[in-house]
Design a protein with these regions (language model features):
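Non-catalytic substrate/cofactor recognition surfaces at enzyme active-site rims
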Residues: 1-314
Length: 314
């Protein structure tokens, strides 16, 4: 194993693994170490199982366009949302059985709302269930089988479904209850149709299967007033050069799998930084010139290009 690259879906219905909300050293609150240990064990077993199951594969790639209506809302100006869902279907070269489907799209998994107290991956769960097992009834399709993996794309700025109603595949509108299921299944239908079209036309077969990657550890400076929170023990550990040149450690990965390019981003990346349209409007979170140009996807060279948010962090 040369590189393990991972990312959080950023679901709002799970224990805090970053310590942004749960770690308050000043009042004696720290991580849920039992949950952290459980998560670490599951990561290790997932990696070892994947390595033990390595097999030659063929790959079909596609990209679904995600409509704004019934899918996305941007809660801060400028109104720019992620409308690209890059997809890859990896199949066993000998048996033609699905090994895994890979998808990435930018949306906060928070459809259950702030009062939901159970652990869930939100709409991601319903997306993965549909991709693996299919759907019955209206807009039905046979699932791909194998494993479905979903990575959160650019969600900063902020991509949410809380401000909209979502109509499910049966025509029923959901304002709260059922919204996450509707969104996950609607998204899976788009993914299925995009991959099916590429398979029928035989245009999505990935000829080049080589793998390459680059990984870089960086230290990001922390300014005031966040330094005050550090001094008071209100922020999780993992900080360097205290107290005057406070920095936080993180990592960025660039990965190529054949004609698929992936970059990871720590934290939440604004869609306009990835796809274009960057501005610096009044009331912006950070007052600065819009210097993030050209957008990152224009710099990437894959036939499909993915940006995994909360990558190598959270």
């Amino acid at each position: 194993i040369d590189l393990i690259s991972f990312a959080s879906t950023h679901t709002h219905s799970a224990p805090d693994t970053l310590g942004l909300w749960s770690y308050k050293e000043l009042i004696g609150r720290k991580f849920d170490h039992e949950y952290m240990t459980f998560m670490e064990e599951r990561i290790i077993s997932s990696v070892t199982d994947a390595v033990d199951s390595l097999t030659p594969a063929k790959t079909i790639i596609a990209e679904a366009k995600v409509p704004i209506e019934n899918f996305s809302f941007d809660s801060r100006p400028p109104f720019i949302v992620d409308q690209k869902m890059p997809l890859a279907l990896f199949k066993n070269l000998k048996t033609d059985e699905t090994i895994v489907t890979l998808a990435s799209w930018g949306m906060h998994p928070e459809g259950f709302g702030p009062k939901f107290t159970k652990i869930s991956s939100d709409f991601v769960h319903y997306f993965r269930e549909a991709m693996e097992g299919g759907l019955d009834g209206k807009s039905d399709f046979k699932g791909f089988g194998g494993k479905s993996i979903f990575f959160t794309g650019p969600v900063g700025g902020l991509m949410t479904q809380l401000n909209i109603d979502i109509t499910d595949r049966f025509g029923v509108k959901h304002g709260h209850e059922g919204k996450s299921k509707a969104q996950g299944e609607n998204l899976a239908i788009l993914a299925y149709e995009a991959l099916r079209e590429q398979r029928v036309k035989e245009q999505g077969n990935m000829d080049f299967q080589g793998i390459a990657f680059s990984a870089k550890t960086i230290y990001l400076p922390i300014g005031w007033p966040l330094k005050a929170a550090v001094a008071l023990g209100l922020v999780h550990p993992g900080l360097y050069e205290l107290p005057f040149k406070t920095k936080v450690k993180t990592e960025i990965n660039a990965i190529r799998i054949g004609e698929i390019e992936i970059i990871t981003s720590p934290g939440e990346m604004f869609p306009e930084i990835i796809d274009g349209g960057i501005e610096s409007p009044l009331g912006a979170d950070i007052k600065t010139d819009p210097i993030e140009i050209p957008p990152l996807r224009k710099l990437m060279k894959g036939k499909i290009n993915m940006n995994f948010n909360l990558g190598m962090d959270e």
